[in-house]
UniProtKB/Swiss-Prot annotation:
This is Vomeromodulin. N-glycosylated. The N-glycans consist mainly of complex sialylated and fucosylated biantennary structures. Residues 1-18 form the signal peptide. Pfam families: LBP_BPI_CETP. Expressed in lung. Not detected in other tissues tested (at protein level). GO terms for molecular function: lipid binding. Keywords: Glycoprotein, Secreted, Signal, Transport. GO terms for biological process: sensory perception of smell. Glycans are attached at residues 421, 516. It is found in: Secreted. InterPro entries: Lipid-bd_serum_glycop_N, Vomeromodulin.
Length: 591
């Protein structure tokens, strides 16, 4: 009995091996590959258990289990757009939208800055400056005293400041650091979590930041004289005395109105990733202070260095259309400066802007990100990438998958043929790769052409001279010079009985083009060849064989003229590109 049990186990293992290498339906006509050996554990198979009955549930089903209904079909067409084209589109589309987003009323950058200035008890200009940055030595200082931008050593001001550096200058003024600094945790996070910064200004979040800011203003008085002395070293003698009054000026009492003026894109970096695109925009925004009172200053200007990080992914409505979607956007105010732009006498008392303490842009960052998240009118919209019009014709295409990779955008489509009054599913197949260095490419599976020809053949039966002819088999082959060879067999009956079998070869030249998502057909019948079995019936069936060839070619030619291709992306289409007939009989065009 144990011999039978061991044999049953061996059979189950062998059956499992066959299931693993079962040929998929889409490649059923290809040569059958040799079975792939099982990946067995290093220690070998466990010895069979000989006690008890055989577990018949281990045996695989005799027939392959069909895929569940509603599953995705195999792709029958593909559209490709290179990463260079995507980069060019974003570089031309994003800058004006990002600049408008910074100016957007619902983001309210100027209002948030005013709110922050109103949270401190002592808001004279000298108290709001970044004292550590102004006093620090090294290169890059705008006043010639180093460290003007508030970065450590030779730090690059164009790079986003980390959370520790955002409060570093102020923290050094307060023994033991800034109390409540933990409230800034995650404030400057530019990616991933869409809710970054959310809730920071609600509850006790703002109070934890406001308190150290007020404490810092009180403690900074110890170095005010040193700051003022350093600033006076770089200004003309004629404005030193008025400047002292300016530095003691209370911003809250003098600013009547703030408004975002000019927004300039300094640089933009686009990274293509496996699941989308990351866009980092570096900007400079000026915020003008109008209506300033006093005998010296008539116009103030704040300058904000900002980063805007945007995540862009593919959005599909599971029909024919694929678009780009700006899914996540975060703003980061890296630093803020104040510029004394204009005086009553027309003189500019300071040659460069003075940096504000870095806790101020940190709080502004949190506030504007909350506003952006709640906004309905400040979002980035990329709907001009694809107009998403329905594409009707001989074939209906539906998006199978769409993804972005470092190479570019790839859209795979399922297809159905609309022939006569019925819809015929087009079986998918393995598609050839896109041409190297292609910017745009469209590939149509050979299964679409085969589906078209087979459906045409069903409507090409002929009756004449007491004979009836019907096409029973079709084969395809690609020839040189973009030529397609179609071979079909014809069953000829006489008086209801089989009389002869004819074979016809059609040689068709293919010179079609694709332009603006439209196939411009150009197919010509070069020649045809006929043969008959048995040969003695040739003379009697030559007429009907010739007629079948004429009807089949006419039907194919008229139907092929209605053939359409997937649109892909309407803003990036092929222009008068030749359609190449591949050896696999797939159709491909590229530019």
């Amino acid at each position: 009995m144990w011999v039978l049990q061991a044999l049953a186990i061996m059979l189950s293992i062998q059956a499992g091996t066959l299931d693993l290498v079962e040929t998929p339906p889409v490649v059923g006509n290809l040569p059958v590959a040799m079975p792939v050996p099982l990946n067995l554990p290093v220690g070998g198979l466990s010895p069979p258990v000989l006690k008890g009955p055989v577990n018949h549930q281990m045996l695989p089903p005799k027939r392959p289990v069909p895929p569940p209904k509603g599953g995705k079909c195999a792709p029958a067409a593909r559209y490709f757009l290179s990463s260079d084209k995507l980069h060019d589109y974003l570089m031309s589309t994003l800058p004006p939208q990002i600049e408008d987003m910074v100016k957007c009323d619902e983001v309210n950058l100027e209002g948030m800055l005013a709110d922050v200035l109103n949270t401190v008890e002592s808001s004279d200009l000298l108290s709001l400056l970044d004292g550590i940055s102004l006093l620090k030595g090294g290169e890059g200082g705008g006043l010639g005293i180093g460290g003007l931008l508030g970065n450590e050593g030779n730090g690059d001001s164009s790079k986003p400041s980390s959370g520790s550096k955002a409060t570093g200058g102020l923290g050094q003024l307060i023994p033991g650091g800034i109390p409540g600094t933990e409230a800034l945790g995650g404030l400057l996070n530019l990616g991933g979590d869409k809710s970054s910064g959310k809730g920071l200004l609600n509850g006790d979040g703002l109070s934890k930041i406001k308190k150290p800011l007020e404490d810092a203003v009180e403690n900074v008085s110890g170095i005010k004289d040193a700051i003022q002395e350093k600033v006076n070293e770089v200004v003309p003698d004629g404005v030193k005395e008025p400047l002292n009054d300016v530095l003691k000026m209370d911003i809250k009492d003098t600013l009547l109105e703030l408004k975002v003026g000019q927004v300039t894109l300094d640089d933009m970096e686009i990274n293509m990733e496996a699941n989308g695109m990351q866009v980092l925009s570096m900007l400079t925004a000026t915020i003008d202070g109008k209506g300033v009172l006093g005998p010296v200053i008539s116009l103030l200007q704040f300058e904000a260095k900002m980063d805007v990080m945007t995540t862009i992914a593919v959005a599909s409505n599971n029909t024919q259309c694929v678009n780009l979607d700006a899914q996540d956007t975060h703003m980061h105010v890296k630093e803020m400066k104040i510029q004394l732009v204009e005086t009553v006498t027309g003189k500019v008392p300071l040659p460069v802007p003075l940096p504000l303490d870095q806790i101020i842009p940190a709080i502004v960052t949190a506030k504007i990100n909350e506003n952006l998240e709640k906004s309905n009118s400040c979002a980035i919209v990329l709907n001009d990438f694809n107009n998403c019009k329905n594409n009707t014709g001989l074939f209906s295409y539906q998006v199978n998958t769409a993804r972005i990779s470092p190479k570019g955008l790839v859209i795979l489509y399922c297809a159905k043929a609309n022939i006569g009054n019925k819809t015929v599913p087009v079986p998918g197949g393995r598609l050839p790769p896109d041409p190297k260095n292609a910017s745009i490419a469209v590939t149509i599976s050979s299964t679409t052409l085969k589906t078209l020809v087979k459906e045409v053949a069903k409507n090409s039966s002929v009756q004449m001279d007491g004979l009836e002819a019907q096409i029973t088999h079709i084969a395809f082959a690609s020839q040189e010079n973009n030529t397609l060879r179609v071979v079909y067999k014809v069953d000829i009956t006489k008086n209801g009985e089989h009389f002869a079998t004819g074979e016809t070869k059609l040689f068709i030249s293919h010179g079609s083009k694709i332009s603006n998502s439209t196939l411009i057909p150009d197919v010509k019948l070069i020649r045809s060849e006929h043969s008959v079995v048995p040969p003695e019936a040739k003379e009697e069936v030559e007429g009907i064989l010739s007629e079948v060839g004429k009807v089949a070619w006419s039907n194919f030619n008229e139907t092929y003229k209605k053939m359409n291709i997937p649109v892909g992306v309407s803003s990036h289409t092929l222009k008068n590109s030749d359609v190449k007939l591949m050896k696999s009989i797939d159709l491909q065009a590229a530019s």
